UniProtKB/Swiss-Prot annotation:
GO terms for cellular component: centrosome; cytoplasm; HAUS complex; kinetochore; microtubule; spindle. It comes from Drosophila melanogaster (Fruit fly). This is Augmin complex subunit dgt5. Signal peptide: none annotated. Residues 87-165, 342-379 form a coiled coil.
Length: 685
């Protein structure tokens, strides 16, 4: 039985410690343990380890016994530190209970007040929502009524305009009141003044809307001016004014025809100067237009900027939870943001502008390269033309060499003819005058025949394709023969050393003297052709009067046989020389190649990259500051969620000369003190 009592006592002790009955060993196992030598250790363990309730009760009894000694005695507060710690904790617990009751009462009162305020806010929200809905309904009705009123006003205005137009288009009847022509003249003069003011407004270059309004106002004034005047009187006055204007124009034309002081024509410098002035005026007009546009954009920017800053400030306040007291910090933050944002936009636009400038310069370089290639091609073509000219010059020189050889042959035949003539003159000196005259005719004919024979002996393949008839040449040569009255002989023009006939005391017949007399008169005197035609058809004196034979004259080109053709050829040569000079001057390129320094561009790009990196660093700093503000806002939000009042109490608001943080720290202190003392027994209620 003794072992059974020990077993039951052990089971009670284990269950008091909190051990479940299923985890206890069986009775046989416990009996074997008690029978063995380890029963003493088990008894010591049971005596040393007691349940928590038993230990707490013992401690409370000891505390009650200690408190009983101080019963009905005065215990000063200063001597609390000399009291036992259990008593100190007990007194603190009592004080904390009182504070807890007060806090609970305050919490209940605050909850009731909060519930009342929330109910009032809900009712007010319902009332405001209903009022807003009613306001929107009334505004919609007002808008509908405004639209209807506007449409009615438009219809009314249109009807008034139609009425005025009908009255204005109705022709005026002629009556005794409006039959005076002076009244019509005054109306026309007034209308002309109104037109002058309107055209002056058009010349000033006002806006299109102002011009439209001025045009409408002009038509209204015209209708009011001609309202009481018939069309017939207006037509008579207008025709009289037109007649006066025509008379004035005719007088001006007569005076202009009489005056001869015309202005001298402008030279190239004055024309270029006027063009430059016109370009300067155009640039000035563009500058003033750009300045006006800049002023308009500045006004628009100021308007939009103020609205943008207000919206941004409200968003920053709402996002960061900034109160009105921290307005300076918010303004500083907004100004920093605006400066950074504007700098970033400015740098982006500057980079885009530089990129466009680089592309434009690259295109200009490509265009310059293409232009250089085109000029190279033109130079090649010009060189080819010059090569053709050189080859033609060489060919002409070869032809001239051949012509010099032909000239030698002609001189040889001429000398041979001179010898033949001398022999014939020596044989005919002994004849009489009549036979001399006959012999003279024969000699002249023989001379022409010999010239023709010598001409035929030459190689015809080397002569020019332009040939003059031999009879014409002979007549031209005969027309240049002149009379020598000293020795009574006939001498060819330009060949004084050659004598066709020796007079030697012989007398010429009268008809031959008359022939020699008329021979000196030019051919133009005997023809019916005018001087201009003779200039075009007569022979060139530079060729005819030269001491050359007919065969030599035939070698000259056809355009040199007349003075007109020679002048035309000279003009052609002058034009050709001026064209070549102009072409050579055009070949001189005035291109100034565009120089792009890649080193400067790299330096500029590096500087811009550094500025961009600095801006990115500033943006990162702003992002970090924003993240800190977000974390602060998140902490405030978590605090609001954990706060039982569900609202933020600012530090400036105090209660009994203490802030909310002081009360919170004191409450946390008491709460830790109560929760850390796990072995303390809570006092009964």
């Amino acid at each position: 039985m003794a072992y059974q009592e020990k077993i039951t006592e052990f089971k009670n002790w284990a269950t008091n410690l909190g051990c479940p009955p299923t985890a206890l060993p069986t009775d046989d196992a416990l009996r074997r343990i008690f029978k063995s030598g380890s029963s003493l250790l088990l008894n010591q363990l049971q005596s040393r380890i007691q349940p928590v309730d038993y230990v707490r009760e013992v401690r409370e009894n000891l505390l009650i016994a200690q408190v009983a000694r101080y019963k009905d005695k005065m215990v000063p507060l200063a001597s609390r530190s000399f009291q036992p710690p259990e008593l100190q904790r007990y007194q603190k617990i009592q004080e904390l209970k009182k504070h807890k009751e007060k806090a609970n009462q305050q919490l209940t009162e605050a909850r009731k007040e909060y519930q009342k305020l929330s109910a009032g806010i809900k009712t007010k929200n319902i009332q405001t929502i209903s009022a807003e809905n009613r306001k929107q309904l009334l505004e919609s009705k007002c808008n509908i009524l405004d639209l209807k009123l506007e449409s009615l006003n438009k219809n009314y205005d249109q009807e008034l305009k139609n009425k005025i137009q009908i009255l204005g288009t109705t022709p005026v009847k002629l009556s005794a009141r409006n039959a005076s022509e002076a009244q019509a003249t005054r109306a026309v003069e007034q209308a002309l003044k109104q037109l002058e003011t309107f055209y002056g407004m058009c010349d000033d270059g006002n806006a299109v809307n102002n011009l439209a309004e001025a045009k409408q106002r002009l038509w209204d004034q015209m209708r009011s001016t001609f309202a009481d005047i018939p069309n017939s009187l207006l037509l008579n006055v207008v025709m009289k004014i037109k007649e006066e204007q025509l008379q004035h124009i005719m007088k001006l034309n007569e005076s202009r025809g009489e005056c001869t002081n015309d202005k001298p024509p402008l030279n190239n410098y004055e024309v270029k100067l006027l063009k430059t002035k016109a370009d300067m005026l155009g640039l000035a007009a563009k500058y003033f237009a750009a300045q006006k546009e800049l002023e308009l954009k500045e006004e628009r920017f100021c308007q939009d900027y103020s609205v943008f800053v207000d919206k941004l400030q409200s968003k920053v306040y709402r996002f960061n939870g900034i109160s009105l007291g921290d307005e300076e910090n918010a303004d500083e933050l907004i100004s920093d943001y605006l400066v950074q944002y504007n700098m970033r936009n400015f740098n982006r636009s500057q980079n885009e502008f530089l990129r466009e400038q680089i592309e434009q310069l690259r295109l200009e370089l490509d265009a310059g390269a293409k232009q250089l290639e085109n000029h190279d091609l033109k130079l090649g073509s010009v060189k080819q033309v010059y090569g053709d000219i050189n080859s033609s010059i060489n060919r002409i020189q070869q032809d001239m060499v051949q012509l010099s050889q032909i000239k030698e042959k002609i001189l040889f035949s001429r000398n041979m003819m001179k010898n033949l003539l001398d022999d014939m003159q020596a044989a005919t000196q002994k004849q009489n005058a009549k036979s001399q005259l006959m012999s003279t005719k024969l000699k002249v004919s023989n001379m022409s025949m010999l010239g023709a024979e010598s001409f035929c002996l030459a190689n015809d393949s080397v002569f020019s394709s332009t040939k003059v008839e031999f009879d014409g040449n002979c007549s031209a040569i005969n027309s240049t023969m002149r009379r020598s009255f000293d020795n009574k002989t006939l001498v060819p023009g330009g060949a004084a050393s050659t004598t066709l006939m020796a007079a030697s005391g012989a007398t010429l017949p009268s008809h031959l003297l008359e022939f020699n007399t008329f021979l000196e008169i030019p051919l133009e005197k005997f023809s019916c052709t005018p001087r201009a035609c003779s200039f075009l058809l007569s022979a060139n004196p530079l060729i005819v009067e030269a001491q050359e034979l007919a065969s030599t004259v035939q070698l000259a080109p056809g355009y040199l046989l007349t003075p007109f053709g020679a002048l035309q050829e000279v003009r052609k040569r002058i034009l050709w020389a001026s064209a070549i000079a102009a072409h050579t001057s055009e070949l001189k390129l005035n291109l100034q190649p565009l120089i792009v320094d890649p080193h400067d561009l790299r330096l500029k790009a590096s500087r811009q990259h550094e500025e961009i990196d600095q801006l990115l660093d500033n943006l990162m700093a702003i992002g970090v500051k924003t993240q800190l503000q977000l974390e602060k806002a998140e902490r405030i939000y978590q605090f609001l969620l954990e706060n039982p009042l569900r609202r933020y109490v600012p530090p400036s608001k105090r209660y009994n000369n203490g802030s909310f943080a002081d009360y919170e720290s004191e409450f946390n202190l008491y709460y830790r003190m109560t929760t850390n003392g796990s072995s303390m027994r809570a006092p009964p209620n």
